A protein has these predicted regions:
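Alpha/beta-hydrolase fold catalytic core
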Residues: 1-21, 41-44, 81-82, 151, ...
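Conserved HGGG/HGGXW glycine-rich cap/lid loop of the alpha/beta-hydrolase fold
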Residues: 9-58
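Conserved acidic catalytic loop of the alpha/beta-hydrolase fold
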Residues: 67-84
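Gly/Ala-rich beta-loop-alpha elbow adjacent to hydrolase catalytic centers
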Residues: 88, 92, 96
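Flexible "cap/lid" loop of the alpha/beta hydrolase fold
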Residues: 97, 101-102, 106-138
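Conserved alpha/beta-hydrolase catalytic His-Asp/Glu region
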Residues: 121-126, 137-197
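Short beta-strand/loop motif that positions the catalytic acidic residue
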Residues: 199, 205-207, 211
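Catalytic active-site module of serine/aspartate enzymes centered on a nucleophile-bearing elbow/loop
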Residues: 229-262
Length: 262
């Protein structure tokens, strides 16, 4: 494994083979994918810390889905990736849908966890309010946001019986730069749905039955619009799928890539 920086974007690079590019969600990092790396051993895997998140440099201007997608394109171009299997979580799935519809030549397949096309209209104001809280309160605000996310975005079973998963989620969120997190929130709040009917690559959509961000009925509706896609719903699982159900995610990815990768 090596850590590389592309225009101040941190990228963890592992292995050799076809490229796989991993795009985390809001409050995430390259560590979101640690639990499923065993399914990616056949690939040259690029785990990106998105602009303004984790170890990547803070940004001075606004973030948007367009700018996040362009950052992924730049990482791929600079690291010699012409086509890649894309993996995404949450906000990262919106970026993946953007790339698959606007740069289909880049995308071999999609494996998406907690996928959504854009936030429901009623959620946008709350996301903007979270951005403002992060800016106004700084580190204490991030700690409070992390606690709220653990309470609202993980399953009851995870909170009761998977303390390591809870710790991973909380640590991931509360260690974000407050301003970078706020800008990422604003990108999510402004996201618009991609025309996913045009997606022709193999697509895996995974969610949990207690995922309020990507509820099963919404994920199935996305799957109905993508020809040949597979939808998987884990029981007693919330939004942080790879942390809450690591073994199941690992097996599902192994099966998916056995069918759709060299």
């Amino acid at each position: 494994m090596s850590t590389q920086f592309v225009s101040r974007i941190a990228v963890e690079v592992d292995g050799e083979g076809e490229a796989a590019v991993c795009i985390h969600g809001l409050g995430g990092s390259s560590n979101n994918w640690t639990t499923v790396m065993g399914a990616l051993s056949r690939f040259r895997t690029l785990r990106v810390d998105m602009p303004g998140s984790a170890r990547s440099a803070s940004v001075s201007g606004p973030l948007s889905i367009d700018s996040l997608a362009q950052a992924v394109r730049e990482v791929c171009a600079r690291l010699g990736v012409e086509r890649a299997h894309l993996l995404g979580h949450s906000l990262g799935t919106i970026v993946c849908f953007k790339l698959a519809t606007e740069s289909p030549q880049l995308v071999r397949s999609l494996a998406l966890f907690g996928p959504l096309l854009c936030p429901p209209e009623g959620a946008r104001a709350n996301i903007r309010a979270r951005a403002q809280r992060a800016r106004d309160e700084g580190v204490p605000g991030m700690q409070a946001i992390a606690d709220a996310i653990v309470a609202g975005a993980t399953s009851a079973e995870t909170r009761q019986h998977r303390p390591a998963a809870v710790a991973l989620v909380r640590e991931s969120v509360m260690r974000q730069d407050p301003d970078g997190y706020a800008r990422s929130c604003e990108a999510l709040a402004e996201a618009q749905a991609a025309a996913v009917e045009s997606i022709a690559c193999p697509t895996l959509l995974v969610t949990g039955d207690e995922d309020g961000v990507a509820p099963p009925q919404s994920v199935r509706a996305i799957g109905d619009r993508i020809a040949g896609s597979r939808v998987v719903v884990y029981s007693r699982c919330g939004h942080w799928t790879t942390f809450e159900r690591p073994d199941e995610c690992l097996r599902e990815l192994k099966d998916f890539y056995s069918a759709h990768a060299r």
